[in-house]
């Protein structure tokens, strides 16, 4: 921003915004008398970030803005401020009164939908059931369509090694994942699986599939970041408004040094604009 020709316009309320190209509206949500030091986990930053998110949700719910593009937050700072949410997704769902949401991650190489998000691996396994899988497949279908894929080809990753190997390495594929895939097929969705997670993401990267349903957080996050962290975008599906964010964390180790790469944030803004246009064409 310092080296650009953009104009910084500080406002006290949204009615003062002019929403003009070349102008960055900065709404003061939290008045911090003493700014915390850069790069340190603390409750002040946690509370301020939470209040900013709540303010953004209210603006979106009141139709003052068409989309929210959030910055990374530090979950430990939230906890220190006694804010008991594991991440953005849960905050957004709670304060927009949305029951079912999903996390979709995209970059220039691949699209991934997570069937479980911010929880322990043991908890994620417990959450895998027929309803969870059907919901994830439907979210993947709608998410891919919102990004311009007319007839999405959906691949569902297995939970266990080798996608369970016919029950030798686990029953979740047989009990839940395969029945959900078959049910989705019956409704007309182009979906297949379960596929071994050590190969399916590369198959999708080659263009064999449009989107992959991953069964737990790191199963989906590792390939998306490996294949393009610099242009990765996190999209929350199911909300009454568009929400995107860059696909990286707070990077406290370089905070205040002026060396952060804005590419992922740029991609998140571009993606939000695309989703807004897609949403408008359906009205």
Regions found by a protein language model. Give the residues of each.
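Glycine/threonine-rich beta-strand-loop-alpha-helix active-site module
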Residues: 80-102
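Beta-strand-turn-beta hairpins that frame and shape the catalytic cleft
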Residues: 20-24, 107-112
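Short, flexible loop segments at boundaries between secondary-structure elements
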Residues: 95-110, 237-253
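Acidic/polar active-site rim loop that often engages polyanionic ligands
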Residues: 72-74, 112-120
């Amino acid at each position: 921003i310092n080296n650009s020709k953009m104009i910084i316009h500080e406002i006290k309320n949204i009615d003062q915004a002019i929403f003009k190209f070349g102008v960055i509206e900065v709404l003061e949500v939290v008045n911090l008398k003493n700014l915390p030091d850069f790069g340190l986990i603390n409750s002040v930053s946690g509370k301020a970030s939470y209040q900013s998110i709540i303010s953004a949700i209210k603006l979106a719910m009141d139709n003052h803005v068409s989309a929210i593009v959030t910055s990374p937050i530090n979950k430990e700072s939230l906890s220190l401020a006694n804010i008991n949410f594991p991440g953005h997704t849960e905050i957004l769902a709670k304060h927009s009164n949305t029951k079912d949401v999903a996390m979709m991650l995209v970059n220039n190489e691949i699209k991934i939908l997570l069937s479980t998000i911010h929880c322990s691996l043991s908890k994620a396994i417990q959450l895998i059931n027929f309803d969870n899988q059907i919901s994830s497949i439907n979210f993947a279908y709608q998410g891919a369509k919102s990004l311009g894929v007319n007839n999405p080809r959906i691949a569902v990753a297995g939970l266990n090694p080798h996608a369970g190997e016919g029950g030798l390495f686990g029953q979740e594929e047989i009990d839940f994942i395969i029945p959900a895939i078959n049910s989705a097929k019956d409704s007309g969705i182009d979906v297949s699986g379960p596929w071994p997670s050590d190969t399916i993401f590369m198959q999708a990267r080659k263009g064999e599939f449009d989107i992959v349903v991953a069964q737990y957080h790191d199963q989906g996050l590792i390939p998306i970041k490996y294949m393009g962290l610099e242009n990765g975008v996190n999209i929350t599906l199911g909300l009454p408004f568009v929400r995107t964010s860059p696909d990286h964390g707070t990077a406290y180790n370089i905070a205040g040094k002026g060396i952060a790469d804005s590419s992922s944030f740029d991609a998140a803004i571009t993606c939000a604009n695309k989703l807004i246009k897609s949403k408008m064409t359906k009205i």
